[in-house]
Amino acid sequence: MSNQHTLLISNLLPVGSNISTWWNFGSMLLTCMALQTSTGFFLAIHYTANINLAFSSVTHILRDVPYGWIMQNLHAIGASLFFICIYTHIARGLYYGLYLNKWVWLSGTILLIILMATAFFGYVLPWGQMSFWAATVITNLLTAIPYLGPTLTTWLWGGFSINDPTLTRFFALHFILPFLIISLSSIHIVLLHNEGSNNPLGTNPDIDKIPFHPYHSYKDMLMATTMITMLFITMSFMPNLFNDPENFSKANPLVTPQHIKPEWYFLFAYGILRSIPNKLGGTLALLMSVIILTAPPFTHTSHVRPMTFRPLTQILFWMLIATFITITWTATKPVEPPFITISQMASTXYFLFFIINPILGWIENKIINK
């Protein structure tokens, strides 16, 4: 164990004095993970992974179990809060060039993929209409894989359609994957403290450092408290803010919802999938929407690390954020004009960010050298 890890345990780890609030989202994600694991455990005690009883067991938790409604709402809204924090965490990494710490960034991307899989499995568990049909549509994408597709789909379903074995294995995966996420998170943190965190200026942080405790630990506590307060306000006054009305009806394989869509935090990937009128092409675009995050560490060309002093790249970054929001919005709409065109244009602009960013870095280098 290195000296830095010893300091980390005793809370004396030296940290750059100028790291901003954007650096608090890592600890907020840790808080979210603790909340999701604890509430998930209590929900698992009362949940029944059976297609005839799953929907009733969720209703039972909400109505009959003491404080069950708090557990269920905390878990459901907590998932949305988790993704708000993680998307902000990723955006911060892109803006400040933190992806140059390659292994931290790549381990984070793997964490994101596993987290998305875990959230998807969890969305299926209540066995409501939207849960069932979202699972049908997304798992069906496996059939787009040449030769192996149909076999893989049958293997995942545990039969020739989504049924009891599918729900059982999804519950098992949703229960076990968070422990893998916790393990990988610890690796992510160890890798981060191996090189140390960067700062908003992108300068050498060794020049001016202060102890992590009490300065940054109190800042972490403030942000975590603010986040939990927001969570409880949402749970108390708007518990169904992120829920789909279709999911209040039990899953019916004979009735298709008018508009099938996953949870809001997957809409950007779902929008990219829908924008391509080809099953295999759409599936590849869906995968690439997340996997492309592994590209920036290898395509960074600028001599300056953060976007703080790069106005051209800043414009491109905020275009990416606007594009992300636009794709999310179009994915909530029916597949008809003008939403198809908007979705296709926004999806193209999303991928263009990762191509134009290194070119802009090279142009900025030329301007600086002049």
Curated annotation (Swiss-Prot):
GO terms for cellular component: mitochondrial inner membrane; respiratory chain complex III. Gene3D superfamilies: Cytochrome Bc1 Complex, Chain C. Keywords: Electron transport, Heme, Iron, Membrane, Metal-binding, Mitochondrion, Mitochondrion inner membrane, Respiratory chain, Transmembrane, Transmembrane helix, Transport, Ubiquinone. A ubiquinone binds at residue 193. Its cofactor is heme b. GO terms for biological process: mitochondrial electron transport, ubiquinol to cytochrome c. The chain crosses the membrane at residues 25-45, 69-90, 105-125, 170-190, 218-238, 280-300, 312-332, 339-358. Heme b b562 binds at residues 75, 174. Pfam families: Cytochrom_B_C, Cytochrome_B. Heme 1 (or BL or b562) is low-potential and absorbs at about 562 nm, and heme 2 (or BH or b566) is high-potential and absorbs at about 566 nm. Belongs to the cytochrome b family. This is Cytochrome b. It comes from Micropechis ikaheca. The lineage of its organism: Eukaryota, Metazoa, Chordata, Craniata, Vertebrata. The gene is MT-CYB.
